[in-house]
């Protein structure tokens, strides 16, 4: 799971890029609706702090998953805090592409643009159905 300590660690390390492996369409726990989830509000704040200087991309843990940050309210909240989507790139590919993007870019914004650009078929326009 995601907790505040993990985000604090990432902020302290001053990484240039981070990949978050979400569930399904790119979900992560950020909605607070009871005592058990009240720390999710702090997760939102830390996520926003992390994205100030760090490229943060969301990928899916589903084999044929595609991140879509405009479907559910939680994903919109994550997107609004500066997290970009890795489309249908697997976590491992997202990691390599992020490293390459950071190496090509002169700043965070350029790295985010490079990461989200399809260069060699690594991002499909539509995901195939494998059901």
Predicted regions and their residues:
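Active-site catalytic microenvironments in core metabolic enzymes, especially phosphate/sugar-handling
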Residues: 11, 20-131
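C-terminal and late-domain segments of enzyme folds
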Residues: 1-20
